[in-house]
Every structure is written in structure tokens, then in C-alpha cells.
Amino acid sequence: MTNAITGAAIVGGVCGQPIKHSMSPVIHNAWIAAAGLDAAYVPFAPAADRFETFVDGLRGGAVRGLNVTIPFKERALAVADTASDLARMAGAANLLVFNEDGSVHADNTDGPGLLGAIAIQAPGFDVTAAPVVILGAGGAARGAVAALLLAGAPRIAVVNRTVARAQDLADTFGEKVVAKGEDALPALLPEAGLIINATSLGLGGGAGPSADLTLTPKTAVVMDMVYKPLRTEFLRRAEAAGRRTVDGLEMLLRQAIPTFETIYGQAPSPKIDVRVLALKLLGEV
């Protein structure tokens, strides 16, 4: 189902590098079609050194809103004129809203999307009960840390190959967040209640992070922000160890809802199950 659009169409989009794998256009355009809106949602892949120029070119209303993904989330916050409390706390943005006066507002729906996905796929999980381990220290990790702290996580270890990058993130958030190298994982995992892959490792079917998930408590939840493939190598290892898992597609769907509401001015239509649609396109059903 598709809609013809006019010159008055509301245009949204997603920006990243690479962007070909993104399911966001499928999700948003399905909601647009179901609602019969005069609107579109378009993928963009600006050169890595042209992101700020690209955003400046959209000021003034050509695009109503823009999702931002790897590797631009931290730069998205920096290019904005104003920002939500959550985006400022995270130090990163995954949504830019373009106002008629030419100003740009930054927001971050990654954290709420993460918590929403956990609530759906790991019901009853208590984020306040045990430490969290996050693999990666980029913009996605920043959004996760901000939301988890607000939700009451007692301690968060950010593990990154480059410890200095993890330390820069930890310094933003205070004493509850610590930076660690990958060699610290054997000591961290036995106490972790939640383990999150916030890197791009595993995208396209490659190997995920090398963490030994058999070291985690049997009650631990393992989450991967990567959603292509749906059952990443990281999640398959978690399942083999008997751990509950949360996939990246559910996080994408949960963060897409407030994005759609912001850009198009209404809630997504319940007429279509976009998860089923996305699963079909991923070859999962």
C-alpha cells in the first residue's frame, strides 16, 4: 500500500553511514500508508565529513524531522540549537526536529526505546536489581546509559576496546558509570543483570562481541541493538546459554513510535503490525 504525495507532503527521514540496512523507512512508510497521510520518510547517507553541512541544508522546513544513527549521534547533538534534557544528559541525539524559523531541536528516543523493548521481551526484568554491562561507547551507548540511570540502574560498566573513549562517556555521567577495557569482562559478567551490545559488531551476520555469556547469571538478560540479522551471533550465544534475549528490532520499533508522533503529529496506526512486516523483509518469517 502506497500513497501519492504532493508538494505539501510532510517529509521525515533517517541519516546514517551506512544506511542501506536501515528498516526505519519500511516502518515509518508503512505507518504513513496505513494512516493515508500526505507524507514520506526517506533514507539519507551523507559523507562522514559532510554531516553538519547536510543538516544545515535542511534548515527551514524541507524536512520536518530526521532520525540519526551510526556514526552521527554525538555530532547531531552538537549541530542542534536546542536539545531535550535526555539528549543533553546522553550527550547524543537520534532525532533532529527542523523548525520553521530555521532552528534545529535535538532529542533522544533511544533510551525509551531500549526500556520499552526490555518491557516487551523480558517482562518482569528489574533494571534496579543488578549492574549493567554495555559493550561500546558511541552515541547508542550514551542514550542507553542515560535512560538506564534514570530508570534506577545501580551501576553501569561501559566496556570498549579503546578505554579512553569509554572513560570520556563515564566522565559525563558520574560515579555510577565506570569505564573498562574488554579484559575486564570475566570479572564483570558474573554480576551483570543486563548485558547490551551497543556496537555494530554482528551487523550483516558477522561475529558479535566476544564476551563469554556463559559467565553471566542465569537470570541475566542479553540485548543486541543490531537487528539485521534479527538473531545475531551474539543473541544466539545468549540463547544457547539459556539467557533471556531482547532483539534490536523491538528497540527500533519502540523508539520509532515517539519519532513518528513528533514528525507526523499523530500516533502510528494500529491497522498494521510493522514488526511482522519488518520480519518478513528480514526473511525471518
From Swiss-Prot:
Record gene name: aroE
Reactions accelerated catalytically: shikimate + NADP(+) = 3-dehydroshikimate + NADPH + H(+)
Biological role: Involved in the biosynthesis of the chorismate, which leads to the biosynthesis of aromatic amino acids. Catalyzes the reversible NADPH linked reduction of 3-dehydroshikimate (DHSA) to yield shikimate (SA).
List of residues binding shikimate: 22-24, 69, 94, 110, 227
SUPFAM superfamilies in UniProt: Aminoacid dehydrogenase-like, N-terminal domain (SSF53223), NAD(P)-binding Rossmann-fold domains (SSF51735)
HAMAP family in alphabetical order: Shikimate_DH_AroE (MF_00222)
Protein name (record): Shikimate dehydrogenase (NADP(+))
GO terms, biological process: amino acid biosynthetic process; aromatic amino acid family biosynthetic process; chorismate biosynthetic process; shikimate metabolic process
Record: residues binding NADP(+): 85, 136-140, 160-165, 225, 248
Subunit structure: Homodimer.
Keyword Transport in record: no
